[in-house]
Every structure is written in C-alpha cells, then in structure tokens.
Amino acid sequence: MNWPFAKKCSILAKLAGIFMYRKIALAIAFSPRMEALIAETKRLVGVFDAELLLIHVGEKTDELEEKLDLILEAHALKGPKTSVLWKEGKPAKRIIQTCEEEQVDLLVLGALKKEGLLTYYIGSVARKVIRKIKCSVLTLIEPQLSTTQFCQVVINGTQLDETPHVIAESLKFCRTLGATQLHILNDIPLYGLQMATAGEGSGDEIALTRRKLVQEEINYVQGILEGLDQSELKVNIKVTAGKWAVELVRYCETIQADLLIMGDQRGYTFIDRLFPHDLEEILAELPCNLLIVK
C-alpha cells in the first residue's frame, strides 16, 4: 500500500474540513478474504483518520482470536483506535444493532460478485444489512491485500429526493480517496411515453423533443454540481433512456468502473423483491464495488 499517498490524502481531507467518517466498521467472517478486507479497511481508516471497529458475529474461540490478532499485528492495527467486538445471534440483526449502538458512520462488507436465484429471494446477510442499516455501506466484491484504487467511479444521478446529497457526498469521497474520473449517470423518466407522444409530430419535432429531454437531465445534474468542490475531478454527465438498473450496470461494465455510488432506497417487502427495484436488481448482480450513501 502507498502509505505516503494515504497520509497525503488524510492531510488534504483535514485541511478541507472533510470528516466524512469518524468511525468505520468492518464485518468479518473467518474466510480466505478476511485479511484483504482488513487491508482495504485500513486504507480507509488512514485516509479518513477514523476509528476502526471490527465486528464478528459467531463463536469466539482462542484460536480465532489469535488468528485475528496476528493479522491485526501484521497490518499495524493493534492500537487505541482499533477495537474488536464479538457478537452472537443472527448476523444481519447483530451487525445493524452494533453499528447503531457504536455510532458507526461507514460499514464495510465483503460480497460475492454473483448470487444465486434462491439467495436473491430469501435475501443474503449483506443485502439485509444494506437495506436496513442507518449508516453508509461500502460493499467490496474483490478486496485486495494491495488495496483497491477507485479511479473510475459511477454515481447515480437519477432525479430522486436524495440525489443532491448523494452527489455531494460522492464528490467528497472521491476527492479524499484520489479518484480522478467521475461519471454521473442520469435517466430520462417516462422516456418511452414522452417519445411516443412526440412521435405524432414530424421527424424534426421528435429530434427536438429528444434533445430537450436530454438537456433537462443534464441541467438537473449541473444545477446540483454548482457550488460543490470539483477540484482535481473530471466529471462526465451521461444520460440514458433504457431500463435504468440495466443501463447502470451495463455502463459500469463498459467503462470497467471500480466503484458505483447510489443513494438509499428503503421499505422493501417480500413482494417488492419478487418485482425488483433498481437497488435490488443491482444487488443481485453487482457490476463493481458499491457504496450506498445514507
């Protein structure tokens, strides 16, 4: 890991008054990817000058405790700003409860890149946590010991109540972590219906309607960006007109995005999951790492 880079980012964050995350938690299972997740979280803790909380839901044994201690020592994480909590019970419920009690600002999770159909309908631990937890959640699909650099970042810019907050927080996050290229993706609501109505006119009228719809979405995002610090960031606004979740995943795959940032969408029932919302569709097949801003 490039610690001079992390230190520089931390100093810049402090000078800019950006204290996004005071406490960062990592939910750990004793899997082969645990050390990589710890390494990734260490980078975030260093960059944001945050406290680290490790949460394990399951049996605590001398063997597991020793294994974790060795990893923490290897990564220089044994200190007053690191704490470990061992919990028992249902993983999702205990993780959510612990993060609330400990006033966690960001939770880091590991996730499989693809999940099976049965898991999708029942709901995995990670998905339950993402839906119900009150803090922001960063889900890493391929954590690395060398840590992941977020270079190509895609942000959901669709017109929702939380979008201005999501974009503002995304810019802070990306500037602090040294991301360079941001793509804000926005879709045209009811595009098919609007174009069908315009289809009654001439070819020029149809083209004019299409350009107007696209420009309205660009203006919406530009209005949010005004007044936000975009220094050292290259921001690209992209407007789509297809099924939003599909287009978002496709765009992430096309540009080989390192990170997708979205806002929170709450209130799902089992029936809702049978007819997926945008977030559910993306959680079913993550195109890249995912940050849910809350």
Name the predicted role of every residue range.
Residues 38, 61-70, 214-222:
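Short, surface-exposed alpha-helical segments at coil->helix boundaries
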Residues 2, 6, 11, 15-19, ...:
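Structural beta-alpha unit
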Residues 15-65, 79, 152-205, 227-230, ...:
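Small/aliphatic-rich secondary-structure junction motif
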Residues 53-55, 85, 108, 138, ...:
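Hydrophobic/aromatic beta-strand patches that form the interior of the parallel beta-sheet core
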Residues 8, 16, 96-146, 250-294:
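Gly/Ser-rich helix-loop-strand patches that form or flank binding pockets
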Residues 204-216:
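A short acidic, glycine-rich active-site loop
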Residues 37-40, 94, 169, 220, ...:
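Well-ordered alpha-helical segments embedded in enzymatic catalytic cores
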Residues 34, 88, 119, 163, ...:
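A conditional alpha-helix N-cap/helix-loop micro-motif detector
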